[in-house]
Structures are given as structure tokens and as C-alpha cells.
Amino acid sequence: MQSIETWIVKINSNKRLIEKGRWVNLTFTFGIGQNDYLFEIIEGKVISTTKRTILTRSGTFKIHGEKIAWEKHWLNIPPRDYHDIFAMLAKKLIILDGNLTPFMQNLQYFKDLIASNRQSIK
């Protein structure tokens, strides 16, 4: 698993992903184990990420999974049930909560954003 900072650089340097998310303007919560991060997105670019320390701060929606689940999802070739966030959701490996309308309206953008933290072939 790469650092959050490295992941954000990968997201913001992916022109196709930014173009796909050009209408996305929101903050969402992404949980890795005990840690939640607020991702602020403007026109498809991640403008800021902050570790959530105040529990009342939240985003439009939340995606949360245990660290081991995300580590498996971010493998270069993820194992069965870890290859896609909906497969993970069906197996109760992640939780999706909140106002899901913008998530579903931009589904491929968010799936690609999350998958962009996958390990590269070396």
C-alpha cells in the first residue's frame, strides 16, 4: 500500500481520470482500518486530503474497509472478491454509506480513483 500522498499524486497526474471526474465537486470519507480520510475533490482533482480527527466531520458519502481488504484490493492482480469495490461490498469487506447519488452518478470515476492505488508491475 502506498502512502496517501503518493496515491493523490497518481490520481491528479492521470488526465483521463480527471477528465472522467470533471463534474465531481464534493468531499467524501475514505476509511482504512481505524483511520478515516476526507478527500476534497474539485472538478475531478483531489484538492486536499485530511485525516479525520473530529468525528462529526464527514463527507457526502463514506467508503470504509479494513486495512487488509484494501491491501488485497490494491495488489497488482487482486484475488477474487477483492478486484472490485462492488465485489467487496457483496462480501461485506467494505461499507458504503451516506448520500450515494453522486457516487453512483460518477461510479466509474470513483472505482478508478480507488483502484489507482494499485501496485505497478515492476
Q: How would you label these PLM feature ranges?
A:
Residues 1-122:
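Feature captures hydrophobic
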